[in-house]
Amino acid sequence: GIKFIGPTAEAMRKMGDKATARKTMIENDVPVTPGTGIVKTVEEVQDFANEVGYPIILKATAGGGGKGMRICRSDEEVELNMELCQSEAKNFFGNPDVYAEKYLENPRHIEVQILGDSFGNVVHLGERDCSIQRRHQKLLEEAPSPAINEETRKQMGAAAVRAAKAINYEGAGTCEFLLDHDGKWYFMEMNTRIQVEHCVTHLKSFL
């Protein structure tokens, strides 16, 4: 017979919806930024923002590539951006659902490459630092990251493995994390595919 090489449709669905991905990570002790589930009203977002403090960011649950995201620094900006973000989400991804997160100012963007087999084994191949970006699009990738120490490297790698095992992941994938100025790091999303940036990891790992 024919076997598809890569993650199952269920694994891709779980990580493709960012609100579901956040919930899955919380259940598996992977740190995430303070955030919400799917929000429908301006008032829900404002209540969350006033609880955690501005700035916050609105994100499309089905989003990617820097689309369907709006940073809000006040209640007024939530009113201005909520409908725009939902409209962008529907136009770009066919799904108007959005959620809110605490926005980290100028974080480092660290991603960890993982590989899983069909027997439940998962390994990570270290991290790439893709903090140099323009309009949320990566311009330069570096491995290993110059911004993290060995302890953080081990913790991020272990979290990426936990994330992959939580969804019975098969094949190559990437867990993306944000690193703040205090050295705290948070899961952002998982790309359920091999990325073009894998060549950077290949040069380091030969895999």
Can you describe what each PLM-predicted range is?
Residues 1-175, 179-204:
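N-terminal beta-alpha lobe that positions the nucleotide/phosphoryl donor
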